[in-house]
Amino acid sequence: MAIVKCKPTSAGRRHVVKIVNPELHKGKPYAPLLDTKSKTGGRNNLGRITTRHIGGGHKQHYRLIDFKRNKLDIPAVVERLEYDPNRSANIALVLYKDGERRYILAPKGLSAGDQIQAGVNAPIKVGNALPMRNIPVGSTVHNVELKPGKGGQIARSAGSYVQIIAREGNYVTLRLRSGEMRKVLAECTATIGEVGNSEHMLRVLGKAGANRWRGVRPTVRGTAMNPVDHPHGGGEGRNFGKHPVSPWGVQTKGKKTRHNKRTDKYIVRRRGK
């Protein structure tokens, strides 16, 4: 993995910082594990914008990732590591002993030729998936389930991980990267290690067009709009004379956004600000 700063051969290249990984496969992805991915432009079925700043971008195929890791007690070999345009992490194509191939998230330290396994009796080794009741306290894991059998939902982006800090009865206590501590059923599956490609956060796109290739449209400040378009719009100068709000008038700084009271009891400590 190398961090490359481009030479300023043009204004658009001047600030570009790229992440170069020579281990990544340079050919086409594995076709049977691809699916179509249609663009919405941030619109719903009525044609109305429901998510701003989405539109355009390069055409992509969705890679079918095995988040469940439910092929138990069958060893697999990592065939290659690949780039995935749909996520910040890289992915690994693994070949199971029975001939099936699947994509998984590529953990840090996993290389082509490594052996991995999922199941209760899998050894504690990077890339192996097993129930958290079988993982030692203090271990670093990723792709953590919230419900047994549902598939990993926590710690899936590049460089992310969760630490198991306690085990009591049917629950384990996890420390998330945000600082939040929460309880999860010990039967839930997690994968050993942290997600790879942690240098992703160091990249610099360098120009607006690179964001447009990714399907991200510009963000316009509310204070630069007219009063008809935003509560901060209009007036003389840049002052809008009120507490900051979203385009729909909802407080935008410090307002609580969590509504799932049903699972509040599993949160031991809130994340730090």
From Swiss-Prot:
SMART domains to which the protein is assigned, alphabetical: Ribosomal_L2 (SM01383), Ribosomal_L2_C (SM01382)
Pfam family, one: Ribosomal_L2_C
InterPro entries linked: NA-bd_OB-fold, Rib_uL2_dom2, Ribosomal_uL2, Ribosomal_uL2_bac/org-type, Ribosomal_uL2_C, Ribosomal_uL2_CS, Ribosomal_uL2_dom3, Ribosomal_uL2_RNA-bd_dom
SUPFAM superfamilies assigned: Nucleic acid-binding proteins (SSF50249), Translation proteins SH3-like domain (SSF50104)
GO BP terms: cytoplasmic translation
Basic residues compositional bias, start-end: 253-273
An example Gene Ontology molecular-function term: transferase activity
Region spans: Disordered: 221-273
Gene Ontology annotations for the cellular component aspect, listed alphabetically: large ribosomal subunit
Keywords in alphabetical order: Ribonucleoprotein, Ribosomal protein, RNA-binding, rRNA-binding
Hydrolase as UniProt keyword: no
PANTHER family: LARGE RIBOSOMAL SUBUNIT PROTEIN UL2M, RIBOSOMAL PROTEIN L2
Subunit structure and binding partners: Part of the 50S ribosomal subunit. Forms a bridge to the 30S subunit in the 70S ribosome.
Role of this protein: One of the primary rRNA binding proteins. Required for association of the 30S and 50S subunits to form the 70S ribosome, for tRNA binding and peptide bond formation. It has been suggested to have peptidyltransferase activity; this is somewhat controversial. Makes several contacts with the 16S rRNA in the 70S ribosome.
Stated family: Belongs to the universal ribosomal protein uL2 family.
Protein name, UniProt field: Large ribosomal subunit protein uL2
Lineage: Bacteria, Pseudomonadati, Pseudomonadota, Gammaproteobacteria, Pasteurellales
